[in-house]
């Protein structure tokens, strides 16, 4: 199983880290760094909804973990000047669980459902009329005496977040008027995020120190902030408390996070594909068995960044490593791979951005 304390996983961390994440989380679109298209569109939609004094259209936010889906949901509520009620798909086990939340919403409030793809079908059925007509259908009684009653709900905005938009049913997906995909962040934006977080936490950090952390953060703000906290520990214990590029480099090397942002889990996945499956193609179930991981861990946690950086390809026959992976480990590239082009995404200096 994947390590619970894996530094570069984008999953939620320990309670203390989560508290610090909340402290450095932006509260407005003006403070929201990166995702320029999403930010510009949401500014427009929110301004229009506020001008009409209406609830914002239901909004679906999807993308890999750690890119700020929850942050954006809270910003939407803040910008709309309304309250937000937060829950998650697995928590809503029965229609009554959802009904209890919906009936306590005020006009134009935001209901945020994380992992919305994990809603049970019976709960999802209750959600349809609530989203479309702002009505709640409730069954009273049991057996032949059971009857349905309709309750009117105040207008509200459902914000759904998911890492697996393809698992949403078509009827649910079609009821979202706004759909936003969050992309991996570039190093420049991540450097800005690291510098901002350091300022909020009262840390002294040089621009190149922020850059060094950012380039190893796998394009993910949550990972960047987590690495910042661990580099801070290193700087306080083995340095003078100031985060320089040299300090960040030493700290991250000690933590086994290389210049590509890979840790031992990523390297194990790539080496398993190369050594046990001759580079692929290999099915995800076979790969999961070989490295003793669950299928969804590979698909949701390990693969997205490796694919985005060009180390793995998905093909109809299975996963295949690219020339990038062989070069990363200093291995000879099999002649059968041909002359595929190599694109080096590692930036060695901030001036190259």
Curated annotation (Swiss-Prot):
Mg(2+) binds at residue 70. Homohexamer. Forms an RuvA(8)-RuvB(12)-Holliday junction (HJ) complex. HJ DNA is sandwiched between 2 RuvA tetramers; dsDNA enters through RuvA and exits via RuvB. An RuvB hexamer assembles on each DNA strand where it exits the tetramer. Each RuvB hexamer is contacted by two RuvA subunits (via domain III) on 2 adjacent RuvB subunits; this complex drives branch migration. In the full resolvosome a probable DNA-RuvA(4)-RuvB(12)-RuvC(2) complex forms which resolves the HJ. It is an enzyme of class 3 (hydrolase). This is Holliday junction branch migration complex subunit RuvB. Has 3 domains, the large (RuvB-L) and small ATPase (RuvB-S) domains and the C-terminal head (RuvB-H) domain. The head domain binds DNA, while the ATPase domains jointly bind ATP, ADP or are empty depending on the state of the subunit in the translocation cycle. During a single DNA translocation step the structure of each domain remains the same, but their relative positions change. GO terms for biological process: DNA recombination; DNA repair. It comes from the Bacteria. Residues 4-185 are annotated as: Large ATPase domain (RuvB-L). The keyword Nucleotide-binding applies. The RuvA-RuvB-RuvC complex processes Holliday junction (HJ) DNA during genetic recombination and DNA repair, while the RuvA-RuvB complex plays an important role in the rescue of blocked DNA replication forks via replication fork reversal (RFR). RuvA specifically binds to HJ cruciform DNA, conferring on it an open structure. The RuvB hexamer acts as an ATP-dependent pump, pulling dsDNA into and through the RuvAB complex. RuvB forms 2 homohexamers on either side of HJ DNA bound by 1 or 2 RuvA tetramers; 4 subunits per hexamer contact DNA at a time. Belongs to the RuvB family. Gene3D superfamilies: 1.10.8.60, P-loop containing nucleotide triphosphate hydrolases (3.40.50.300), Winged helix-like DNA-binding domain superfamily/Winged helix DNA-binding domain (1.10.10.10). The gene is ruvB. It comes from Pseudomonas savastanoi pv. phaseolicola (strain 1448A / Race 6). Residues 186-256 are annotated as: Small ATPAse domain (RuvB-S). It is found in: Cytoplasm. Residues 259-353 are annotated as: Head domain (RuvB-H). Keywords: ATP-binding, Cytoplasm, DNA damage, DNA recombination, DNA repair, DNA-binding, Hydrolase, Nucleotide-binding. The lineage of its organism: Bacteria, Pseudomonadati, Pseudomonadota, Gammaproteobacteria, Pseudomonadales.
């Amino acid at each position: 199983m994947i390590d619970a304390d894996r530094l570069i996983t984008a999953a939620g961390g320990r309670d203390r880290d989560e508290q610090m994440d909340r402290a450095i989380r932006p509260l407005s679109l003006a403070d929201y760094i990166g995702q320029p298209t999403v930010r510009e569109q949401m500014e427009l939609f929110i301004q229009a909804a506020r001008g009409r004094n209406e609830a914002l259209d239901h909004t679906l936010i999807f993308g890999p973990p750690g890119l700020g889906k929850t942050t954006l949901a809270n910003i939407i509520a803040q910008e709309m000047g309304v309250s937000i009620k937060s829950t998650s798909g697995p928590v809503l086990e029965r229609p009554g669980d959802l009904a209890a939340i919906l009936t306590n919403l005020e006009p134009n409030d935001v209901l945020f459902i994380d992992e919305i793809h994990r809603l049970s079908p019976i709960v999802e059925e209750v959600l349809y009329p609530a989203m479309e007509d702002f009505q709640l259908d409730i069954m009273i009684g049991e057996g032949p005496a059971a009857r349905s009653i309709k309750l009117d709900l105040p207008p509200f905005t459902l914000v759904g977040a998911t890492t697996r938009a393809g698992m949403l049913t078509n009827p649910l997906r079609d009821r979202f008027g706004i759909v936003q995909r969050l992309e991996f962040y570039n190093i420049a934006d991540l450097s800005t995020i690291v510098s901002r977080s350091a300022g909020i936490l009262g840390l002294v950090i040089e621009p190149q120190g922020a850059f060094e952390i950012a380039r190893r953060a796998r394009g993910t703000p949550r990972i960047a902030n987590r690495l910042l906290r661990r580099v801070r520990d290193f700087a306080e214990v083995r340095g003078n408390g100031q985060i320089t590029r040299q300090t960040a480099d030493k700290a991250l090397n000690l933590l086994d996070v290389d210049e590509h942002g890979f840790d031992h889990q990523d390297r194990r996945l790539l080496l398993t594909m190369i050594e046990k499956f001759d580079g692929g193609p290999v099915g995800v179930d076979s790969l999961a068995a070989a490295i003793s991981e669950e299928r969804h861990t590979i698909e949701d946690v390990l693969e997205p960044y490796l694919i985005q950086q060009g180390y793995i390809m998905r093909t109809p026959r299975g996963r295949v490593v690219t020339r990038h992976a062989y070069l990363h480990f200093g291995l000879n590239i099999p002649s059968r791979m041909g002359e595929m082009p190599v694109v080096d995404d590692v930036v060695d200096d901030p001036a190259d951005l």
